Design a protein with these regions (language model features):
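Phosphate-binding glycine-rich loop
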Residues: 31-80, 94-97, 104-105, 171
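N-terminal "arm"/small-domain region of PLP-dependent enzymes with the aminotransferase-like
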Residues: 1-26, 31
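Structured helix-beta-strand junction loops
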Residues: 24, 46, 125-126, 151-152, ...
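Short clusters of hydrophobic/aromatic residues that line enzyme substrate/ligand-binding pockets
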Residues: 5, 27, 114, 164, ...
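PLP-dependent aminotransferase-like
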Residues: 68-135, 139-151, 155-160, 167
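Conserved active-site segment immediately N-terminal to the catalytic lysine
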Residues: 158-178
Length: 178
């Protein structure tokens, strides 16, 4: 039996749209991208949506923005970020690249989301942020995470690449932190 490695999954309409973009000379950040960003922001009830080539780039951009000297209160080298141990290198490495120290904590065995009790136990005077990953469509307990971050004046940044369309108490994932 022959099982193909891959197959063409694009419809003719999608191919035509791609060719239209290529012919326009605007293959990145063009009118179609701007229209899609606007539509996605409306869909997700967000003020803004900015598209990048990957979640990895989004993570890097977030940490570099937070350490940029022109930001209202830039994070200083040595800041700590609480992250789940079930993670990716592209979650951890941008923190390190921007001068931070990742602090790994346990995850819930049922959801693979960051364990809230572990987050609370890991908070130190150097903790600047909590960076939960929302794996496989599972949204973390955002009520508790938000309350913890508010109580300790810690930044909350969600990595919601895997929860597109998921909601927590009616609110779209990705809309709880920065």
């Amino acid at each position: 039996m022959h099982i193909p490695l891959s197959y063409i999954s694009y419809a003719e309409e999608e191919i035509a749209e791609a060719l239209d973009s290529l012919r326009s000379g605007s293959v990145t950040m063009g009118a179609k991208c701007l229209a899609f960003e606007k539509a996605f922001a409306q869909y997700s009830n967000s003020r803004h949506a900015i598209f990048l080539n990957s979640g990895s780039s989004a993570n890097l951009l977030a940490w570099f923005a937070l350490t940029n000297p022109t930001w209202k209160k830039p994070l200083q080298p040595g800041f700590e970020v609480i992250v789940p141990a079930v993670s990716w290198s592209t979650t951890i490495w941008p923190i390190v690249q921007s001068g931070g120290v990742p602090v790994l904590v346990d995850c819930s065995p049922d959801t693979l989301c960051i364990d809230i009790a572990s987050v609370e136990a890991a908070i130190s005077p150097k903790t600047a942020a909590v960076f939960p990953i929302q794996p496989l469509g599972n949204v973390c307990d955002m009520d508790r995470l938000t309350a913890i971050c508010d109580q300790h004046q810690i930044i909350l940044i969600e990595d919601s690449c895997q929860t597109l369309g998921s909601r927590y108490r009616g609110r779209m994932a990705g809309n709880f932190g920065l």
